[in-house]
């Protein structure tokens, strides 16, 4: 089982953005020190829900500050990025980190980002498959041209090429690409391309198991080898808060997370003025406490093991900054690595 952290760079009420980003960086450094497998970085624009606007840039910093841990984006928002530019960045990080970078991509939401960065609502509603396929071609082929509805350009060479990684085998020829999936449509899209899924922390085990089953069915129907389908490295996002008593862990989150959630979710603005109902912050926090490893080390290990058994997923990206406090976050990460991980081996 491969357990990592999910870093949103969440700005809690009363905190500055520099303070928030410092906590995000420190949580990743402590994750490596504590023996965790990976760090997954979120990306948001114009909202305190998360103050990292470029997951791939923060990934570059963390890859430079660490030696062993895998660093991934969860996710880079594809509709507001040029697939070739993102592909070049991914290839660069893949080569310079010795293959420790994973590129998670997703559609994002119908937010004002689409206006600011220029692609418009159509890129969000219809353009994701074209962007994803162009990105994959850039990471896998020596020369690429664009002939799609959104991206059209003459053939150019891929520089640098991911398959020129030093000391790598065939499995290292391309950085891992993973797709955030929230619907049967996105599951089918990922499965047809043989790409593993990132499944959100709002989903319970039953929903995730259904999505994994659908992915397997669609991947096999698309002609992917059964052994590749069986070995797909899907990632389950969740929340982790470790304490000596379950009530103490839950109390920490229920007391502190709703303030961040309300401030962050309320700040989202749709590009076309459509109404988007946001979750009740307290109810959502309580839901997360019930779904994920929130409690004692034994309870946390049991929850992770149960999720893995029910869904077949063995990789986890766990939000560890739910207290909003630097020292508490560092302690939470250390306990996850030193007290929970040993119970899973």
Predicted regions and their residues:
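Short, acidic/polar
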Residues: 18-30, 181-188, 299-306
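Conserved, mostly hydrophobic/aromatic
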Residues: 31, 35, 43, 62, ...
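N-terminal beta1-alpha1-beta2 module of alpha/beta enzyme domains
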Residues: 1-71, 175
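Hydrophobic faces of well-ordered beta-strands that scaffold small-molecule active sites
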Residues: 3-7, 39-41, 71-73, 101-105, ...
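An alpha-helical appendage that flanks or caps ligand/catalytic pockets
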Residues: 125-164, 206-314
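Internal, glycine-rich beta/alpha segment that forms the wall or movable "lid"
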Residues: 1, 82-195, 206-213, 217-230
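Active-site mouth loops of central-metabolism enzymes
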Residues: 7-22, 76-84, 171-181, 288-297
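Alpha-helix-loop-beta-strand connector modules within alpha/beta enzyme cores
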Residues: 52-73, 127, 131, 334-345
């Amino acid at each position: 089982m491969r357990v990592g952290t999910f870093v949103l760079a969440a700005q809690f009420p009363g905190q500055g953005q520099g303070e928030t980003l410092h906590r995000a960086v420190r949580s990743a450094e402590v994750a490596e020190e504590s023996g965790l497998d990976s760090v997954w970085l979120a990306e948001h624009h114009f909202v305190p829900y998360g103050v990292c606007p470029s997951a791939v840039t923060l990934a570059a910093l963390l890859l430079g500050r660490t030696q062993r841990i895998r660093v991934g984006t969860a996710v880079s928002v594809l509709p507001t990025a040029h697939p070739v530019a993102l592909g070049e960045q991914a290839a660069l990080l893949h080569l310079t980190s010795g293959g420790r970078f994973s590129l998670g991509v997703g559609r994002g939401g119908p937010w004002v980002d689409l206006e600011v960065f220029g692609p418009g609502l159509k890129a969000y509603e219809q353009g994701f498959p074209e962007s994803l396929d162009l990105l994959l071609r850039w990471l896998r082929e020596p020369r690429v041209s664009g002939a799609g509805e959104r991206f059209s350009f003459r053939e150019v060479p891929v520089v640098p090429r991911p398959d020129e990684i030093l000391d790598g085998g065939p499995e290292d020829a391309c950085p891992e690409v993973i797709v955030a999936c929230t619907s049967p449509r996105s599951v089918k899209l990922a499965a047809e391309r043989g790409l593993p899924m990132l499944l959100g922390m709002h989903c319970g085990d039953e929903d995730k198991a259904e999505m994994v089953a659908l992915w397997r069915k669609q991947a096999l129907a698309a002609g992917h080898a059964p052994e590749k389908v069986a070995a797909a490295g899907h990632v389950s996002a969740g929340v982790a808060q470790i304490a000596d008593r379950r009530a103490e862990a839950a109390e920490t989150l229920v007391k502190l997370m709703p303030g961040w959630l309300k401030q962050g979710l309320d700040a989202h603005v749709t590009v076309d003025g459509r109404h988007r109902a946001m979750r009740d912050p307290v109810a959502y926090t309580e839901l997360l406490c019930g779904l994920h490893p929130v409690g004692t080390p034994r309870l946390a290990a049991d929850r992770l093991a149960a999720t893995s058994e029910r869904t077949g997923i063995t990789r986890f990206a766990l939000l560890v900054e739910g207290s909003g406090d630097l020292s508490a976050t560092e302690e939470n990460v250390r306990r996850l690595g030193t007290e929970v991980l040993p119970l899973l081996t």
